[in-house]
Regions:
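Single conserved hydrophobic/aromatic residue that forms the stacking wall/gate
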Residues: 1-17
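Charged, compositionally biased boundary regions
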Residues: 13-14, 19-258, 262-287
């Protein structure tokens, strides 16, 4: 076990080293009786490392109190009950910043990725749209798919939803083509990562059976780049459930398991996306 001072001597980030004050929060199991000894030693170590202690809180048996506050009305010895997570001020602040609440368990996460209710209009539209295939019209169909993706993102950015069922159907059918799928993957930008995260998740949940794997695999990469590694794996579960032989999903599963930095996707886009655009639009697409 390292003291706070020994930790301080390690490779702290510049943000931590530049901190003016410290907040110490100690979560104590019900069965522990000598926590005050550890907390006192840790507090003294922080002070000696030039991290002034602004507040020290203990949390035990779903109650909390301050070790610094001397007001018995504010911080009685028995502590105050913890607020409900959904009602806490920090929860409201995070939601206002666009950050979703964490999932309570793996089942909640899985359910958040499941398909929405069946949309019969989309399924009907899908039957009218031919796949790209290798034909004289393949290039035109790929262009149609890429342009539909651009329109979809614009709609989603404006309204948080896409109401054009024909457009959604075109995307889902065209993304069975590898070039259109790669265009969707390469269109993501770090500056608009949250937009693509929300849009591709929504599109995946709209997709009927046999059309999930391409969009789910693309969405898994966005999850990974966003730092949502567990979600990325669960999204791949959906992709492989839809198509057990989907090659890119298997490749991403192996890649995610290596724990490599998410930034690698930005590097890949920078190198590959211009080539994909050129292949689809013959260099005519201006981005």
């Amino acid at each position: 076990q390292k003291t706070a001072y020994e930790i301080y001597q390690c490779d702290w980030s510049s943000d931590v080293c530049s901190s003016d004050l410290t907040l110490l929060v100690s979560y104590i199991p019900d069965s522990v009786s000598d926590a005050d000894v550890v907390i006192k030693a840790l507090s003294e170590s922080l002070e000696s490392a030039n991290f002034p202690l602004r507040e020290s809180l203990i949390v035990v048996a779903n109650r909390w109190r301050s070790l610094i506050c001397a007001d018995a009305l504010c911080c009685p010895m028995e502590g105050q009950p913890l607020p409900a997570f959904e009602q806490a001020r920090v929860t409201a602040e995070q939601i206002s910043l666009g950050n979703p609440l964490p999932y309570r368990n793996a089942e909640d996460l899985r359910q958040s990725l499941e398909r929405f209710d069946v949309d019969e209009e989309i399924e009907s539209e899908i039957t009218t749209i031919p796949e790209v295939a290798d034909s004289e019209t393949a290039q035109k169909r790929r262009q149609e798919g890429a342009e539909a993706l651009i329109d979809f993102i614009n709609d989603f950015e404006s309204d948080g939803i896409c109401r054009d069922k024909k457009l959604i159907a075109i995307i889902l059918v065209r993304m069975k083509d590898l070039q259109v799928r790669d265009f969707a993957l390469g269109s993501v930008t770090h500056e608009r990562l949250n937009l693509y995260f929300d849009a591709y998740k929504w599109l995946m949940r709209m997709a009927p059976q046999n059309y999930v794997a391409p969009i789910a695999t693309v969405f898994s990469a966005v999850c990974y780049e966003k730092g949502e590694g567990v979600m990325a794996q669960r999204v791949l579960d959906r992709a492989l459930s839809d198509d057990p032989d989907y090659a890119l999903a298997h490749l991403f599963r192996q890649f995610f398991a290596t724990g490599r930095k998410p930034e690698i996707f930005a590097d890949m886009r920078k190198e590959l996306h211009p080539k994909v655009c050129d292949a689809i639009f013959s260099g005519t697409l201006q981005r």
